[in-house]
Amino acid sequence: MNRLKSDQKTKLRQFVQWTQVTEAVSLNFLAKANWNIEYAMTLYFDNPNLFAGSTPQPSVDRSNIERLFNQYVDPKDKVGEKRMGPHGINRLLTDLGYEATDRRVLVLAWKFTAQTQCEFSLDEWVKGMTALQADTVQNLRQRIDSINSGLESDKAKFHELYLFAFNYAKSAACRNLDLETAICCWDVLFGQRSTIMTQWIDFLWAQENAAASRLAQNVGASNAKQFKSVWISRDTWNLFWDFILLSKPDLSDYDDEGAWPVLIDQFVDYCRENLNYPKPGNASNDQQMETPSYY
Protein backbone atom coordinates (compact mmCIF):
# COMPACT_ATOMS: atom_id res chain seq x y z
CA MET A 1 0.00 0.00 0.00
CA ASN A 2 2.99 2.31 0.57
CA ARG A 3 3.62 2.39 -3.18
CA LEU A 4 0.17 3.78 -3.89
CA LYS A 5 -0.40 7.42 -4.69
CA SER A 6 -2.37 9.53 -2.23
CA ASP A 7 -5.58 9.50 -4.29
CA GLN A 8 -5.28 5.72 -4.77
CA LYS A 9 -4.95 5.21 -1.02
CA THR A 10 -8.10 7.28 -0.52
CA LYS A 11 -10.01 5.20 -3.07
CA LEU A 12 -8.75 1.99 -1.48
CA ARG A 13 -9.97 3.06 1.96
CA GLN A 14 -13.35 4.03 0.50
CA PHE A 15 -13.69 0.71 -1.32
CA VAL A 16 -12.86 -1.27 1.83
CA GLN A 17 -15.28 0.82 3.88
CA TRP A 18 -18.15 0.39 1.43
CA THR A 19 -17.68 -3.31 0.65
CA GLN A 20 -16.10 -4.65 3.85
CA VAL A 21 -13.70 -6.83 1.84
CA THR A 22 -9.95 -7.04 2.39
CA GLU A 23 -7.43 -4.58 0.99
CA ALA A 24 -6.04 -7.28 -1.29
CA VAL A 25 -9.43 -7.96 -2.86
CA SER A 26 -10.14 -4.23 -3.08
CA LEU A 27 -6.87 -3.66 -4.93
CA ASN A 28 -7.83 -6.31 -7.50
CA PHE A 29 -11.14 -4.63 -8.27
CA LEU A 30 -9.67 -1.13 -8.38
CA ALA A 31 -6.82 -2.23 -10.63
CA LYS A 32 -9.22 -3.94 -13.03
CA ALA A 33 -11.29 -0.75 -13.14
CA ASN A 34 -8.16 1.35 -13.77
CA TRP A 35 -8.77 3.04 -10.41
CA ASN A 36 -12.20 4.30 -11.42
CA ILE A 37 -13.88 3.68 -8.07
CA GLU A 38 -17.44 3.89 -9.43
CA TYR A 39 -16.68 1.26 -12.06
CA ALA A 40 -14.85 -0.87 -9.47
CA MET A 41 -17.91 -0.77 -7.22
CA THR A 42 -20.12 -1.81 -10.12
CA LEU A 43 -17.81 -4.74 -10.87
CA TYR A 44 -17.91 -5.79 -7.23
CA PHE A 45 -21.69 -5.68 -6.80
CA ASP A 46 -22.20 -7.50 -10.10
CA ASN A 47 -19.73 -10.26 -9.22
CA PRO A 48 -18.19 -10.09 -5.74
CA ASN A 49 -16.31 -13.36 -6.32
CA LEU A 50 -14.71 -12.19 -9.56
CA PHE A 51 -11.19 -12.87 -8.32
CA ALA A 52 -10.00 -16.24 -7.08
CA GLY A 53 -9.52 -16.24 -3.37
CA SER A 54 -11.84 -13.29 -2.79
CA THR A 55 -13.84 -13.35 0.38
CA PRO A 56 -17.57 -14.04 0.20
CA GLN A 57 -20.03 -11.18 0.41
CA PRO A 58 -20.36 -9.80 3.91
CA SER A 59 -23.61 -10.93 5.43
CA VAL A 60 -26.50 -8.59 6.07
CA ASP A 61 -29.12 -9.01 8.74
CA ARG A 62 -32.45 -10.00 7.18
CA SER A 63 -34.30 -8.87 10.30
CA ASN A 64 -32.80 -5.40 9.87
CA ILE A 65 -33.82 -5.38 6.23
CA GLU A 66 -37.41 -6.35 7.05
CA ARG A 67 -37.54 -3.89 9.94
CA LEU A 68 -36.44 -1.11 7.61
CA PHE A 69 -39.08 -2.16 5.07
CA ASN A 70 -41.82 -1.98 7.70
CA GLN A 71 -40.80 1.57 8.57
CA TYR A 72 -41.92 2.62 5.11
CA VAL A 73 -45.12 0.60 4.85
CA ASP A 74 -47.95 3.13 5.04
CA PRO A 75 -51.59 2.00 5.57
CA LYS A 76 -52.75 5.01 3.52
CA ASP A 77 -51.30 3.43 0.40
CA LYS A 78 -53.74 0.49 0.33
CA VAL A 79 -51.48 -1.54 -1.96
CA GLY A 80 -51.94 -4.85 -0.20
CA GLU A 81 -50.17 -6.76 2.52
CA LYS A 82 -46.37 -6.68 2.71
CA ARG A 83 -46.07 -3.94 0.10
CA MET A 84 -44.52 -0.49 0.22
CA GLY A 85 -46.60 2.07 -1.67
CA PRO A 86 -46.25 5.66 -2.94
CA HIS A 87 -46.41 7.37 0.47
CA GLY A 88 -43.77 5.07 1.91
CA ILE A 89 -41.53 5.35 -1.13
CA ASN A 90 -41.75 9.14 -1.02
CA ARG A 91 -40.49 9.01 2.57
CA LEU A 92 -37.74 6.61 1.53
CA LEU A 93 -36.63 8.94 -1.27
CA THR A 94 -36.60 11.85 1.16
CA ASP A 95 -34.37 9.87 3.52
CA LEU A 96 -32.12 8.92 0.61
CA GLY A 97 -31.97 12.54 -0.52
CA TYR A 98 -33.32 11.74 -4.00
CA GLU A 99 -35.76 13.78 -6.07
CA ALA A 100 -38.45 11.79 -7.88
CA THR A 101 -36.88 12.64 -11.26
CA ASP A 102 -33.38 11.56 -10.20
CA ARG A 103 -31.99 8.69 -12.29
CA ARG A 104 -30.94 7.01 -9.06
CA VAL A 105 -34.62 6.35 -8.31
CA LEU A 106 -34.84 4.34 -11.53
CA VAL A 107 -31.57 2.57 -10.64
CA LEU A 108 -33.09 1.64 -7.28
CA ALA A 109 -36.17 0.13 -8.95
CA TRP A 110 -33.94 -1.70 -11.44
CA LYS A 111 -31.75 -3.23 -8.76
CA PHE A 112 -34.85 -4.32 -6.85
CA THR A 113 -36.38 -5.72 -10.09
CA ALA A 114 -39.55 -3.82 -9.20
CA GLN A 115 -42.62 -4.77 -11.21
CA THR A 116 -44.87 -1.81 -10.35
CA GLN A 117 -44.09 1.90 -10.28
CA CYS A 118 -43.91 3.45 -6.80
CA GLU A 119 -44.28 0.06 -5.10
CA PHE A 120 -41.95 -2.55 -3.63
CA SER A 121 -43.04 -5.95 -2.42
CA LEU A 122 -41.32 -7.35 0.65
CA ASP A 123 -39.71 -10.01 -1.55
CA GLU A 124 -38.33 -7.39 -3.98
CA TRP A 125 -37.02 -5.37 -1.06
CA VAL A 126 -35.31 -8.27 0.71
CA LYS A 127 -33.73 -9.67 -2.45
CA GLY A 128 -32.63 -6.23 -3.62
CA MET A 129 -31.13 -5.18 -0.30
CA THR A 130 -29.40 -8.54 0.09
CA ALA A 131 -27.91 -8.38 -3.40
CA LEU A 132 -26.67 -4.86 -2.68
CA GLN A 133 -25.41 -5.92 0.76
CA ALA A 134 -27.29 -3.07 2.42
CA ASP A 135 -29.39 -3.09 5.57
CA THR A 136 -29.48 0.64 6.32
CA VAL A 137 -30.59 3.69 4.34
CA GLN A 138 -27.02 4.99 4.41
CA ASN A 139 -25.62 1.77 2.93
CA LEU A 140 -28.38 1.68 0.33
CA ARG A 141 -27.54 5.20 -0.82
CA GLN A 142 -23.84 4.37 -1.07
CA ARG A 143 -24.60 1.34 -3.24
CA ILE A 144 -27.08 3.11 -5.52
CA ASP A 145 -24.88 6.20 -5.90
CA SER A 146 -21.95 4.00 -6.86
CA ILE A 147 -23.93 1.99 -9.41
CA ASN A 148 -25.39 5.15 -10.93
CA SER A 149 -21.95 6.76 -11.29
CA GLY A 150 -20.59 3.59 -12.87
CA LEU A 151 -23.16 3.70 -15.67
CA GLU A 152 -21.19 6.44 -17.41
CA SER A 153 -18.31 4.02 -18.01
CA ASP A 154 -20.30 0.79 -18.36
CA LYS A 155 -22.46 1.04 -21.45
CA ALA A 156 -23.69 -2.56 -21.14
CA LYS A 157 -25.13 -1.90 -17.68
CA PHE A 158 -26.61 1.39 -18.85
CA HIS A 159 -28.31 -0.55 -21.65
CA GLU A 160 -29.77 -3.00 -19.12
CA LEU A 161 -31.24 -0.08 -17.18
CA TYR A 162 -32.61 1.42 -20.40
CA LEU A 163 -34.39 -1.80 -21.36
CA PHE A 164 -35.76 -2.20 -17.82
CA ALA A 165 -37.26 1.30 -17.92
CA PHE A 166 -39.77 0.44 -20.67
CA ASN A 167 -41.58 -2.29 -18.75
CA TYR A 168 -41.32 -0.42 -15.48
CA ALA A 169 -42.75 2.83 -16.84
CA LYS A 170 -45.61 1.58 -18.97
CA SER A 171 -49.06 0.78 -17.70
CA ALA A 172 -49.62 -2.93 -17.12
CA ALA A 173 -52.72 -2.73 -19.29
CA CYS A 174 -50.81 -1.30 -22.29
CA ARG A 175 -48.35 -2.85 -24.70
CA ASN A 176 -46.82 0.53 -25.56
CA LEU A 177 -45.54 3.56 -23.69
CA ASP A 178 -47.48 6.82 -23.92
CA LEU A 179 -45.50 9.74 -25.33
CA GLU A 180 -45.37 11.91 -22.22
CA THR A 181 -44.08 9.05 -20.08
CA ALA A 182 -41.52 8.02 -22.70
CA ILE A 183 -40.12 11.56 -22.88
CA CYS A 184 -39.96 11.74 -19.10
CA CYS A 185 -38.00 8.45 -19.05
CA TRP A 186 -35.54 9.64 -21.70
CA ASP A 187 -34.92 12.80 -19.70
CA VAL A 188 -34.36 10.81 -16.51
CA LEU A 189 -32.04 8.34 -18.24
CA PHE A 190 -29.97 10.69 -20.35
CA GLY A 191 -30.14 13.99 -18.48
CA GLN A 192 -29.51 17.19 -20.40
CA ARG A 193 -30.86 16.88 -23.92
CA SER A 194 -28.47 16.81 -26.85
CA THR A 195 -29.39 18.53 -30.11
CA ILE A 196 -30.60 15.31 -31.70
CA MET A 197 -32.62 14.36 -28.61
CA THR A 198 -34.28 17.78 -28.54
CA GLN A 199 -35.16 17.46 -32.22
CA TRP A 200 -36.49 13.93 -31.70
CA ILE A 201 -38.80 15.07 -28.91
CA ASP A 202 -39.93 18.14 -30.89
CA PHE A 203 -40.73 15.83 -33.80
CA LEU A 204 -42.76 13.48 -31.62
CA TRP A 205 -44.82 16.35 -30.19
CA ALA A 206 -45.37 17.70 -33.70
CA GLN A 207 -46.67 14.27 -34.73
CA GLU A 208 -48.92 14.13 -31.67
CA ASN A 209 -50.31 17.63 -32.21
CA ALA A 210 -50.92 17.07 -35.92
CA ALA A 211 -52.79 13.84 -35.21
CA ALA A 212 -54.82 15.53 -32.47
CA SER A 213 -55.75 18.34 -34.85
CA ARG A 214 -56.97 15.89 -37.47
CA LEU A 215 -58.94 13.99 -34.86
CA ALA A 216 -60.51 17.18 -33.53
CA GLN A 217 -61.95 17.89 -36.96
CA ASN A 218 -63.81 14.59 -36.82
CA VAL A 219 -64.86 14.23 -33.19
CA GLY A 220 -64.53 17.75 -31.78
CA ALA A 221 -61.73 19.34 -29.78
CA SER A 222 -63.06 18.31 -26.36
CA ASN A 223 -63.39 14.66 -27.38
CA ALA A 224 -60.01 14.63 -29.13
CA LYS A 225 -58.26 15.44 -25.84
CA GLN A 226 -59.25 12.00 -24.55
CA PHE A 227 -57.07 10.23 -27.11
CA LYS A 228 -53.31 9.84 -27.44
CA SER A 229 -52.07 9.46 -31.00
CA VAL A 230 -48.35 8.74 -30.66
CA TRP A 231 -47.26 5.72 -28.66
CA ILE A 232 -43.74 4.34 -28.27
CA SER A 233 -43.62 0.62 -28.98
CA ARG A 234 -41.08 -1.69 -27.38
CA ASP A 235 -39.35 -2.06 -30.75
CA THR A 236 -39.06 1.72 -31.16
CA TRP A 237 -37.86 2.12 -27.57
CA ASN A 238 -35.22 -0.61 -27.87
CA LEU A 239 -33.88 0.45 -31.27
CA PHE A 240 -33.82 4.13 -30.36
CA TRP A 241 -30.89 3.23 -28.09
CA ASP A 242 -28.95 1.94 -31.11
CA PHE A 243 -30.04 4.91 -33.20
CA ILE A 244 -28.93 7.56 -30.70
CA LEU A 245 -25.76 5.65 -29.84
CA LEU A 246 -24.51 4.66 -33.29
CA SER A 247 -25.65 7.41 -35.65
CA LYS A 248 -23.44 10.32 -36.64
CA PRO A 249 -24.68 13.66 -35.30
CA ASP A 250 -25.88 14.70 -38.77
CA LEU A 251 -27.44 11.24 -39.46
CA SER A 252 -25.44 11.05 -42.69
CA ASP A 253 -24.73 7.37 -42.05
CA TYR A 254 -28.39 6.43 -41.53
CA ASP A 255 -29.30 3.30 -43.49
CA ASP A 256 -32.62 3.93 -45.19
CA GLU A 257 -32.84 0.24 -46.04
CA GLY A 258 -32.18 -0.87 -42.47
CA ALA A 259 -34.83 -2.49 -40.30
CA TRP A 260 -35.59 0.67 -38.32
CA PRO A 261 -39.03 1.32 -36.82
CA VAL A 262 -41.29 3.50 -38.96
CA LEU A 263 -41.25 6.31 -36.41
CA ILE A 264 -37.46 6.60 -36.60
CA ASP A 265 -37.58 6.51 -40.41
CA GLN A 266 -40.10 9.34 -40.31
CA PHE A 267 -37.91 11.33 -37.94
CA VAL A 268 -34.89 11.06 -40.25
CA ASP A 269 -37.05 12.20 -43.20
CA TYR A 270 -38.28 15.10 -41.05
CA CYS A 271 -34.71 16.15 -40.25
CA ARG A 272 -33.71 16.03 -43.90
CA GLU A 273 -36.72 17.98 -45.11
CA ASN A 274 -37.03 20.54 -42.32
CA LEU A 275 -33.67 20.83 -40.55
CA ASN A 276 -31.25 20.71 -43.51
CA TYR A 277 -29.76 17.38 -42.60
CA PRO A 278 -27.83 15.84 -45.51
CA LYS A 279 -29.77 13.48 -47.73
CA PRO A 280 -28.39 10.07 -48.75
CA GLY A 281 -25.29 10.46 -50.91
CA ASN A 282 -25.05 14.14 -50.03
CA ALA A 283 -23.46 14.05 -46.58
CA SER A 284 -21.96 17.24 -45.26
CA ASN A 285 -18.74 17.44 -43.32
CA ASP A 286 -19.45 20.98 -42.16
CA GLN A 287 -22.50 20.46 -39.97
CA GLN A 288 -21.48 20.89 -36.33
CA MET A 289 -23.45 19.28 -33.52
CA GLU A 290 -22.37 18.09 -30.13
CA THR A 291 -22.01 14.41 -29.45
CA PRO A 292 -24.34 13.43 -26.58
CA SER A 293 -22.52 12.81 -23.31
CA TYR A 294 -24.04 9.33 -23.13
CA TYR A 295 -22.30 8.16 -26.30
Swiss-Prot record:
Pfam families listed in its UniProt record: Cullin_binding, UBA_4
InterPro entries, per database record: DCN-prot (IPR014764), DCN1-like_PONY (IPR042460), PONY_dom (IPR005176), UBA-like_sf (IPR009060)
GO CC field: cytoplasm; nucleus; ubiquitin ligase complex
Main localization category: nucleus
Domain (UBA-like): residue spans on this chain: 8-45
Free-text function comment from the UniProt entry: Required for neddylation of cullin components of SCF-type E3 ubiquitin ligase complexes. Neddylation of cullins play an essential role in the regulation of SCF-type complexes activity. Does not act by preventing deneddylation, but rather facilitates neddylation, possibly by acting with rbx-1 to recruit the Nedd8-charged E2 enzyme to the cullin component of SCF-type complexes.
Designated name of the protein: Defective in cullin neddylation protein 1
Organism of origin: Caenorhabditis elegans
